[in-house]
Amino acid sequence: MKTLIARHKAGEHIGICSVCSAHPLVIEAALAFDRNSTRKVLIEATSNQVNQFGGYTGMTPADFREFVFTIADKVGFARERIILGGDHLGPNCWQQENADAAMEKSVELVKAYVRAGFSKIHLDASMSCAGDPIPLAPETVAERAAVLCFAAESVATDCQREQLSYVIGTEVPVPGGEASAIQSVHITHVEDAANTLRTHQKAFIARGLTEALTRVIAIVVQPGVEFDHSNIIHYQPQEAQALAQWIENTRMVYEAHSTDYQTRTAYWELVRDHFAILKVGPALTFALREAIFALAQIEQELIAPENRSGCLAVIEEVMLDEPQYWKKYYRTGFNDSLLDIRYSLSDRIRYYWPHSRIKNSVETMMVNLEGVDIPLGMISQYLPKQFERIQSGELSAIPHQLIMDKIYDVLRAYRYGCAE
């Protein structure tokens, strides 16, 4: 990360896409996409996904590292080209507890990530805990971030410190996307970004972390990009020019969250304006969902009724029976809920792919389709971009490859924007 940031600060148009997903097919796609390039791949886990207690994936940071490395070995991607990051590391998972208890767990969380070899650490202490004022004072956020940084430094080896980098910032979107419809977003004021940096510098120095400050590579701000279930707030470069100019006088770049669904031109403009770390998550699993839904429609027409997976019906039934991952995010009417379950840009389906019933139905669908020749006309109907690549000889009409290429479409836009 430090080398890439140095190249950007030296004037090169270069950025990096941060893949924020724990889905094995998304991780496989991210690694396979860059297998034959010289680029490194940044893969991040969030604190609610992966933590010392397992998170909702059931994985600790060490488990997640091995999970990613196993996929890398399968793909033939060198492990040393992978950068592992920890996102929203702080009290996010324990906001219902008092600050002392939440921070105690947060300290152990950060230590677990660093011990597991994660080298990009987002110190996110921006959320209020039980009994805290809402919002927290910037000084409190910075002081708690310094506590987390001290924890990271205390367990990092000398070798790790050479690679270790930190991201700070208080204007952080809700992990997992917005819960309600949005029409506009508040772009961070330069004064607030400067205050974030100033308060963190003061808090770090007070804890004897002057050297660690040199490892702070980025600050999270809101450049004016966001999405909800059916709306996308597109990047307007002219609105972020003050931010773009201010960061040029620092050693840092910006990290932009929720960049999913922007245009490839917007990614290029974001990187030009020093938002050099572009985080993406739901757009990748949304592309995965699109591919699976398309293949399910193809299966419906090609496979005898008694042998079909019933994949779409299984997904719908499981999500309606177990609504905990979407209920507070989606609309309440039955028909509206079904539309959101299937097609929402916030893609809450991503939490359900590991469910045994859904996983088994998808596997059945894949086996069914691997045993037949899919007519080109059907691929043109349901996966038109993939049809074009099959026609040009770039792609084969194999279900797994079709899914990979659908995810590649998202990564292609980021590659254009990051322009290495």
From Swiss-Prot:
GO biological process per UniProt: D-tagatose 6-phosphate catabolic process; galactitol metabolic process; phosphoenolpyruvate-dependent sugar phosphotransferase system
Keyword Magnesium: no
Keyword set, alphabetical order: Galactitol metabolism
Stored InterPro entries: Aldolase_TIM, GatZ/KbaZ-like, GatZ_KbaZ_carbometab, TagBP_ald_GatZ
Source superkingdom: Bacteria
Pathway, per record: Carbohydrate metabolism; D-tagatose 6-phosphate degradation; D-glyceraldehyde 3-phosphate and glycerone phosphate from D-tagatose 6-phosphate: step 2/2
The UniProt record lists the keyword Kinase: no
UniProt family annotation: Belongs to the GatZ/KbaZ family. GatZ subfamily.
Complex and partners: Forms a complex with GatY.
Official protein name in the record: D-tagatose-1,6-bisphosphate aldolase subunit GatZ
Name of encoding gene: gatZ
